[in-house]
Every structure is written in C-alpha cells, then in structure tokens.
Amino acid sequence: MMYKKIILLICLIIGLSVILYGLKQYRYSTDEQKVTIQFSSWGSESEIKILKPLLLDFEHDNPDIKVDFMHIPQNYFQKLHLLFASNTAPDVIFINNQYLPVYANAGLFEDLSGEDEIFHFKDFYTKSLDALRWQGKLYAVPRDISNLVIYYNKNIFDRYGVSYPDNDWDYEKFLETAKKLTHRPEVFGISFEEEPIFYLPYLMSFGLDKEPVFDDIATHEGLKIYAGLRSKYHIAPRREEAASATMAQMFLQGRLAMHLSGRWLVPKYRQEAKFDWDIINFPKGTAGSVVPLDASGWAISKASKHKPQAKQLVKYLSSKQSIERLTQSGLIVPARIETANSKYFFDNQQPNNADTFLSVIETSRPTPVTVNYREVLDTLKTKTEKLFNLN
C-alpha cells in the first residue's frame, strides 16, 4: 500500500513538472513573438501616473507589442541627442515644436504627412499640426496646444475697485488697469519673466512675424515695450523685488494682480489659490492680440525597425480616449478638437473663462522656430539681461 502511494506521488510530481515546464515554454514562446518598442517622454509625476496605465492598456489591446517606457524627467533633449548619436534612439519620441526642427532637418524623424488614414488629421486643430511641421512635412501627431493667457486675481481687482478685463481690451487699457492695481511693494499689476516665451506676446502683438533677433527693429521695439513694465511704469516686480519667488508664487501670495502664463498652472492654482481667479486673453497691440502657439506630440524615429508597431502606439496615444484621460489632469489644452470642446476640458472648475484657451488658438501664431532656435533664445537672454534690469 505504501509502495503504491509513493508511485502515485512520484507520478503526480512528474505530471506537475511537465505542466509547469510547458507553461514556462509557452511563456517564453509568447515573449519571443512580442515586438518590443521603446518610447521616451518627459513629464511630471502627475502626467506619468496617467501615462503608465495608458501604456498598459495599449499592451493589453495589442498583446504582440511590448512598450519599454523611458521616462526622462530632466535634461530630456540632451539625453535624446546622445541616444540619436549612439544609434539607440527610441522608436516613439515625445517632442515639442521648438526642438522638432533639429531632428527633422537632420532626417532623424519619420515623415507622417501621408498617414491620414491612420491618424485622421482633420480631428486636430490645424495650428497644432502646423506647429509640428518642418519644411511642409508633418513629423509628429499632436497631443496638446500650449498658448498664453493672463490669469487675474479677482479679489485684488475688487479691493481696488478695478473692473475685470474683457476680451476686447487693448494695450492702453491693459496699462491703465495694471497701474491701478499696483500698490508697491505689496502688490504689482503684472508679472515679469525674463524667459523669451513670456515676452513674445508683447513682440508679436506689436508686429513681429518672424524669429526674434535682438537687433531687428520689430524685436527691439517690442522688447522696449516689455522692459518698460519694470523700468518705465514699475507695474511689474523688478528682480530684487521678486527675490527668490517665482511669478506663480507671487500670484498665489496675492502680490501679483495679473500673471501671464499657460494652461500648465491650472492644477496648481486650483489646488493652492486662496482667492477667486480667472483668465483673459492678452490685450490687443497694433497687430492684434497675438501670442505664440506651441505644441507637443509623438514622433517616430526614421531608424526604427518596428515602424508599424510604433505607428500603432502613436495612434493609441493620440486617440480620443487617450487624450480625454490626459486632459482630465487639467494640465493641457488638447489638440483634438472634439476633446477640447468636451466635458473633459470644460470640467466645471476654475477658470470660469476656460473657453479663452480655445479662442486664443484662433488669434495665436505657431512660434517661428528654426534649427538654431535654442541658440537664438540663448542669445536673446544674454542681450536682454541689461535691458530688463534698468532701474
């Protein structure tokens, strides 16, 4: 009897071993059949928390594709340069319009212009597509649009008896409003940041229609207008008055009545602002109310060995359901027209004038970038240092 039990136990062990071996071989076989594609992106912690589940859902819907996600939170483009230089670039690359020309001009990105059947470009804002073109060819499918609006603290307006701005205001009305709101050193009328993105609206609304060059007349005139907010009218905080505080921090502290910035601050202001606030478009200059329009999206490496799978991933990430989930974060203005006009963007939270982000698209212009755009901006930052700090 004992002998039979031992035989049965041995048979059971052998049987289980065979089954486990078979499962192991099946798993190895399945993994070998999968195509692995690499995808790189920058992004805040909150963005990545949304992105990672999207990638898992993609893998679930596409069991033959595995996504190797490369999150590069800092020095993204320096690392991307190195990856291309060493022929180890990802298959799918998150990119913005300011850096896209560098890679597109070098022939490193796949031309997606002829892929309308896959991506249905009519579903996206035309200007978001224009921003991601280089020399007439489309090199990325857009995720979002980035433009600038003026955030304003309604409590400060109420305190000093100043009417809220309307979307038809001009630069003279803007100056008049900012002067009334300025009560130094406690409160300044308008923000001042020395990064080019924040003074481009002042240049473009007064006639600049090309890449900014310091010695160009239109650029220089616009820069003088901007510098005057500090030096001439003193309605914006000078460097020593802001000290180590950012403009966003000053706005939250109630020290700025108006702050020129982008959609990316909405989640922060929703969470941290202890006052009522809203947004309005940039005032009209001699050329109208014109702010730069930037865009981010997904490009595909020309050297990718898995282009069909890479296109599948880009199609999924840029799809209606993916963009809806990304939009719910409050961080982006979606490039998909339907999503931008949906409950996912108009979510019954501040700002009340959320439609301003969309109306500004109509009057904005894609930032005039070139292959050397970053060098142009670095030169501008050097040359404007003195101009912006005249007391």
Where are the model-predicted features located?
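Conserved N-terminal structural module of periplasmic/extracytoplasmic solute-binding proteins
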Residues: 1-102, 164, 284-287, 308-309, ...
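Extracytoplasmic "Venus flytrap"/periplasmic binding protein-like
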Residues: 57, 62-124, 159-161, 250, ...
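A structural signal for short loop-to-beta-strand junctions that line the ligand-binding cleft
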Residues: 82, 90-91, 119-156, 185-192, ...
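Hinge/lid segment of periplasmic solute-binding proteins
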Residues: 97-149, 183, 278-280, 346-350, ...
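Periplasmic solute-binding protein
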Residues: 101-108, 128-165, 192-211, 293-300, ...
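Glycine-centered hinge/linker elements that transmit conformational signals in sensory
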Residues: 178-179, 212-243
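Periplasmic-binding protein-like
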Residues: 315-338
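C-terminal capping/gating helix-and-loop segments adjacent to ligand/active sites or protein-protein/ligand interfaces
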Residues: 335, 339, 349-391
